[in-house]
């Protein structure tokens, strides 16, 4: 089966690098599915789960807090603002971040504070959703 080179990187580290049969991630306009031979594309990505079906058939999951996706004929590159391997996601930390963001939202004094709190809340909610999706998938295996 055809494969495509996939790299997921954040400012801190390279999270994934390898060959994949399929990549799914939250694009700006909705969920994107990328197969080998996909049309070249550059777009922003929303906070959420990146699912990579590796060449071996194993699935890798990475949570990204937004970023940029570049698709070229033989490569997919995800440049993430922040990226966390699926196995490293922590529901308690994500829930605490959600609560802090909601509290900050309630106490926002300026438009900048409000926008920052909304962004933090969206990221925390996306992380919790990614954790739930990953738990469901793991439950099927």
Curated annotation (Swiss-Prot):
Localization, UniProt: Cell inner membrane
UniProt-recorded name of the protein: ATP synthase epsilon chain
InterPro entries attached to this UniProt entry: ATP_F1_dsu/esu_C_sf, ATP_synth_F1_dsu/esu, ATP_synth_F1_dsu/esu_N, ATP_synth_F1_esu_C, ATPsynth_dsu/esu_N
GO cellular component, one term: proton-transporting ATP synthase complex
Gene name of the encoded protein: atpC
Primary localisation category: membrane
Organism field: Burkholderia thailandensis (strain ATCC 700388 / DSM 13276 / CCUG 48851 / CIP 106301 / E264)
GO molecular function, a single term: proton-transporting ATP synthase activity, rotational mechanism
Role: Produces ATP from ADP in the presence of a proton gradient across the membrane.
Family from the record: Belongs to the ATPase epsilon chain family.
Highest taxon, organism lineage: Bacteria
Gene3D superfamilies reported in the protein's UniProt record: ATP synthase delta/epsilon subunit, C-terminal domain (1.20.5.440), F0F1 ATP synthase delta/epsilon subunit, N-terminal (2.60.15.10)
Topological relation to the membrane, as annotated: Peripheral membrane protein
Keyword Ribosomal protein recorded: no
Phylogenetic placement of the source organism: Bacteria, Pseudomonadati, Pseudomonadota, Betaproteobacteria, Burkholderiales
Keywords: ATP synthesis, Cell inner membrane, Cell membrane, CF(1), Hydrogen ion transport, Ion transport, Membrane, Transport
Oligomeric and partner information: F-type ATPases have 2 components, CF(1) - the catalytic core - and CF(0) - the membrane proton channel. CF(1) has five subunits: alpha(3), beta(3), gamma(1), delta(1), epsilon(1). CF(0) has three main subunits: a, b and c.
